[in-house]
Regions:
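RNA substrate-binding interface of SAM-dependent RNA methyltransferases
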Residues: 2-101
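Glycine- and other small-residue-rich loops at beta-strand/loop junctions that grip anionic moieties
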Residues: 22-23, 56, 125, 149, ...
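Short, electropositive, low-hydrophobicity segments enriched in small/polar residues
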Residues: 27, 31, 127-131, 151
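Short, glycine/charged-enriched secondary-structure capping and boundary segments
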Residues: 35, 60-62, 115-117, 134-137, ...
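A short acidic, often aromatic-flanked loop/helix-cap motif at beta-alpha or helix-coil junctions
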Residues: 86-93, 108-110, 150-151
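Active-site/ligand-binding-proximal alpha/beta "capping" segment
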Residues: 95, 99-145
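Structured adenosyl-cofactor binding patch, chiefly the S-adenosyl-L-methionine
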Residues: 130-167
């Protein structure tokens, strides 16, 4: 009799690239957002310094460790990329995803699961101001609804990523 020790089954890699651009929330909310988005299938996280963000010091290394631990916990075969915080203008200028969504408190449709890759832009506490929304529209981001309720940034991040990742 030959036995082989195996670990838990590995989940498949996300079907499409899903980029999360998240306005930096205050306190530990970004830590939670990174963890939940990783579990939901995000492939790339871009922390965004928005007008209403409470920007903290360089915590990208911490977020990378959190993402790596979350990926291991959910048996993901890979870790998402975690960028250094960037201004909204810089972050939007780097997006190459063919599908681009901005989560707004609207009656619009939910984001469909992505086939080719998508980016979702989530605001910080208090949301984006009108000029930031206009900038996102100018970069090809269409409004999308994540449901009828006002969500915390970290919850919106997880829901947006999960819907785009088809989970």
């Amino acid at each position: 009799v030959v036995a082989e020790a195996v670990g838990p089954p590995r989940a498949p890699a996300p079907r499409a690239d899903v980029v999360l651009l998240l306005g930096l929330p205050k306190g530990p909310a970004m830590d939670l957002a990174v963890r939940m988005a990783t579990e939901a299938g995000v492939t790339h996280v871009v922390p965004v310094i928005a007008r209403r963000s409470v920007a903290t010091g360089d915590r990208a290394d911490r977020w990378r460790r959190i993402a790596s631990a979350a990926a291991r916990q959910c048996c993901r075969p890979d870790d998402p990329l975690i960028d250094e915080p960037a201004s909204l203008t810089d972050a939007l200028g780097r997006v190459t995803a063919p599908e681009r969504w901005i989560a707004l408190p609207t009656d619009g449709p939910p984001p469909p699961p992505s086939v080719e890759g998508a980016a979702v832009l989530i605001g910080p506490e208090g949301g984006f101001d009108p000029a930031e929304i206009a900038l996102a529209h100018a970069h090809g981001f269409a409004p999308v609804s994540l449901g009828p309720f006002v969500l915390r940034a970290e919850t919106a991040a997880a829901i947006g990523v999960a819907r785009l990742a088809g989970r």
